[in-house]
């Protein structure tokens, strides 16, 4: 049976004549499939229906084939013979094949668009994951910097406490030296005049014992206690510093000043008392002190 030309087939499938001619020309008359691909890809172009300026037969510098010449308007056959007409059944069969080809092309285009959409979605998710990872890295860097800052502040605080302890030790050494000088410069005690010989050794008055150390127990507000031995001539400030350095973090961790109290008799030690030796405050040889938070002045 006679075959429809590419142009006739496109027109039979419902494409406008001008658009079909343009598709064949721009694809170099490579056949109906190439023309249909072009038509489906450019169906939404605003200039798709604009006519070509050059003759259809000379597109891309190519001479049309004999079958294409038969489909060009105004061109006759080389021998001048007429083209046999298609029967209605042949025309319907060829139209059916063309429609199936169009449907196949449509399915291929939909599958391609679906693959492209899936690829765009994968790209979007990948970019989202990369952005989330970048944010997490930034957060980790900030947390690391904050931890380093806390460690630096802690080291500076410990260094400051060490300087305070060293100063207290120097002050204690100076006071010990001062005490030693003043005690040595005191005149020797006057010997009492001899009295009557006691009738029994048990009647002699007890000798007062001098203590060089004292044991201090400090009760904290949470019910726990600290126990430490100090020299009798150390200042009460040394006890307060020891408490501030060793009490738990939940009690302030050395951040707030503390008030020292004695239980029996009840007494609150003042700042002036902090400069006095433990033996002078009556805390030798042992004593129990109570810690309370110092009220702001």
From Swiss-Prot:
Residues 41-211 are annotated as: Disordered. It comes from the Eukaryota. The gene is UBXN1. It comes from Homo sapiens. Residues 186-199 have a biased composition (Pro residues). Interacts with MAVS; this interaction prevents MAVS oligomerization and thus disrupts the RLR signaling pathway. Interacts with CUL1; this interaction inhibits CUL1-mediated degradation of NF-kappa-B inhibitors. Interacts with BIRC2/c-IAP1; this interaction prevents TNFalpha-stimulated RIP1 ubiquitination and subsequent NF-kappa-B activation. Component of a complex required to couple retrotranslocation, ubiquitination and deglycosylation composed of NGLY1, SAKS1, AMFR, VCP and RAD23B. Interacts with HOMER2. Interacts directly with VCP. Ubiquitin-binding protein that plays a role in the modulation of innate immune response. Blocks both the RIG-I-like receptors (RLR) and NF-kappa-B pathways. Following viral infection, UBXN1 is induced and recruited to the RLR component MAVS. In turn, interferes with MAVS oligomerization, and disrupts the MAVS/TRAF3/TRAF6 signalosome. This function probably serves as a brake to prevent excessive RLR signaling. Interferes with the TNFalpha-triggered NF-kappa-B pathway by interacting with cellular inhibitors of apoptosis proteins (cIAPs) and thereby inhibiting their recruitment to TNFR1. SUPFAM superfamilies: UBA-like, Ubiquitin-like. This is UBX domain-containing protein 1. One of its GO terms (molecular function) is K48-linked polyubiquitin modification-dependent protein binding. The modification Phosphothreonine is found at residues 207, 229.
């Amino acid at each position: 049976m006679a075959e429809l030309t590419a142009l006739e087939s496109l027109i039979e499938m419902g494409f406008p004549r001008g658009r079909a001619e343009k598709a064949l020309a721009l694809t170099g008359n490579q056949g109906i499939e190439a023309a249909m691909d072009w038509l489906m890809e450019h169906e939404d172009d605003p200039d798709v229906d604009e006519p070509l300026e050059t003759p259809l037969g000379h597109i891309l510098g190519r001479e049309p084939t004999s079958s294409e010449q038969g489909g060009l308007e105004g061109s006759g056959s080389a021998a001048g013979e007429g083209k046999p007409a298609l029967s209605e059944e042949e025309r319907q069969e060829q139209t059916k094949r063309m429609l199936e080809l169009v449907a196949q092309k449509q399915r291929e285009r939909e599958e391609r668009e679906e693959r492209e959409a899936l690829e765009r979605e994968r790209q979007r998710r990948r970019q989202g994951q990369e952005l989330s990872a970048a944010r997490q890295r930034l957060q980790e860097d900030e947390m690391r910097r904050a931890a380093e800052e806390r460690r630096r502040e802690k080291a500076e605080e410990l260094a400051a406490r060490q300087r305070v302890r060293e100063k207290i030790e120097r002050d204690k050494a100076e006071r010990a030296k001062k005490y030693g000088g003043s005690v040595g410069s005191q005149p020797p005690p006057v010997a009492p005049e001899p009295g009557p010989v006691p009738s029994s050794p048990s009647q002699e008055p007890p000798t007062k014992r001098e203590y060089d150390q004292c044991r201090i127990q400090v009760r904290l507000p949470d019910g726990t206690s600290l126990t430490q031995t100090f020299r009798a001539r150390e200042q009460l400030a040394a006890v307060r510093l020891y408490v501030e350095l060793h009490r738990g973090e939940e009690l302030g961790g050395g951040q707030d000043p503390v008030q020292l109290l004695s239980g029996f008799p009840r007494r609150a030690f003042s700042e002036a008392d902090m400069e006095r030796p433990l033996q002078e405050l009556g805390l030798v040889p042992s004593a129990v002190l109570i810690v309370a938070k110092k009220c702001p002045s």
